[in-house]
Amino acid sequence: MARLTSILVFLIAFGISIPSQSSPEVAKEPLQSSVKIPSASQWDMRSVLNGHTYRIFVSTPSSSPPPGGFPVIYVLDGNAAFPVAALLARNTESRSAVTGIVPPVVVGIGYPNDEDYDVSARKRDYTISEKKADSSADEGAADEFLDVLEKEIKPAITSAYPINANRQAIFGHSFGGLLVLHALFTRTKSFTTYLASSPSIWWKERILLNELPAFKLAMSDQPAPYIQLSVGSLEDQVRPPSLAGGTQTSVNKRAMVTETHNLASVLQTFPALKNRFHYYELVDEDHGSSWLPAMSRGFRLFLSNQ
């Protein structure tokens, strides 16, 4: 007993801890922090024009801007699409010395929540209507949104970052692709490159196509922008087949591949768009995945035409 007491005194004196057999050590959870995107920032902006709030994401190159400023690409559904676009921009910058391509500023336009897609807000902002929508509309407010983009978001970006106003692109998918085409047909000078991924041409009995004649006429007396139109080859198929039935009927009515292909066939006949219009049917991509290769190809088209 005396020996055990001496050992305990020795251990305590030298600060040596004694493991407890009855209370095994429990591993602590590692400290956690939010994931950050390099060279990126965000803020919320309440529009004076329509009263809605938008979350603006911006990624900037780390290099010095060229004399004319950086090209800029505006990306719709920013909550989901901005991280991918920002990565593509960083990859472009990392290879700039080899390719000679100037990296872009990326501006994601999203909504102040943690969802990838704000279903109700994007339906409101990205869909078109034959008549002007009011501030309480839940759809068909594309023109009001484009006014916000043109008169509020763009000036805010231009005042804060060295932007080349002669090199501006817009990318959108699904309803976002519909908005991109509507902007192309009705506001042809707003951007120099329009990237429409899997556009919802079916919306409201294809009223988008009513804008084609005026667009063709406008193209006869002004420089044509660069255009990319794309769709996934599997977008008209329901997988797995067990989900067919009502779901397949809905997909058939939208006819994403057929409608996009038909529009491409029309645009390819416009003389002003020769060498400026690019159409892709993306093999083995469905509606949920097609925007990823579409964005990658769109970056290439936009940035390679300096």
Language model regions located:
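N-terminal signal peptide c-region/cleavage motif recognized by signal peptidases
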Residues: G15-P19
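Bacterial N-terminal signal peptides that target proteins for export
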Residues: M1-L8
